[in-house]
Amino acid sequence: MRRGTASPHIFTEDFCMEIDKRLIVLLKRSADEIKKTVIGKDDIIIKILMTACAGGHILLEDIPGVGKTTMAVAFSKALSLKYNRMQFTSDVMPADVTGFYMPNRATGEFDFKPGAVFCNLFLADEINRTSSKTQSALLEAMEEGAVTVDSVTRKLPNPFIVLATQNPSGSAGTQLLPESQLDRFMIRLSMGYPTVGEETEILKAKSSKKAAPEVNPIMTAQDLIEIRSAAEDIFVSDEIYDYIARLSGATRSDRRLELGVSTRGSLAAAAMAKCAAMFKGRNFVIPEDVTFVYTDVCAHRIIPARVKGKLPSDSEVREILCDICRGVTPPKI
């Protein structure tokens, strides 16, 4: 892991006896494997893995061409997940996502043709370019882990993870996702442009005659299910729960925000804090675990107040949230 880019204490060797060391090693090896093809995004890799371990879905908001699809493909390979990708354009129908019935001439009956979400990892590319009906079809799959077609409900494979991308608001042909759908994503991340050094490394790798490094499978879907179970068992004290509640409460009373963090956001922050603790080799959560994830988990769930008729930028919204968090005293643990 590159010095200066990863969060401190991630993947330390000081494992708690209660945590299965094999699972932590699998996560570390998976992160290292993904870094073969995704250069300079160590924190993003860690947080995507954490979200998968917490049972959540990921929203990557960024301009085209910064490696979102490369990240998703590498992630699916390292975790041995069945992977489907769909480009969400204006003509994509809900049935393309969920599936539909088609006539079988041999039997005279209708057979179900599964949609693109019948996989372990579904990359919903440019989700904010499609219709609200198609977005709603994906919403059910994300929320229920199942889809309903003609009154018949079908379970999706376990694990099921949505990694959606969207272009920044204001891009041509895009529309803002409704708050109800944004709230279903456990975390929103931005990969951002690479540094000059990182882009130089990417250019050299792409120009080389050598074959691109292969991302090898490190863990299985069953390993991920075990990791999720282990993460759920991480201990959270009453003081930490109170800290998360006070953080979210502070967002609801701040005049700079029209809408604060929902209870769903608080639950997501608690789940992600458990995974942060597990990644650091602890079987209990400390305040630093909460602060490590809170902004990424909650920034897309708040609505800022207008300033002189204009909405603050995303970076300004994140700074408002960070400022609110700094004003909440963490417990001494």
Question: How would you describe each model-predicted region?
Answer:
Residues A52-T89:
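Walker A/P-loop
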Residues S253-I333:
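C-terminal engagement/docking regions of AAA+ P-loop ATPases
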Residues K47-M50, P103-L123:
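Conserved alpha-helical scaffold flanking the Walker A/P-loop in AAA+ ATPase domains
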Residues N104-E109, T130, T134, M142-M219, ...:
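Canonical AAA+ ATPase core
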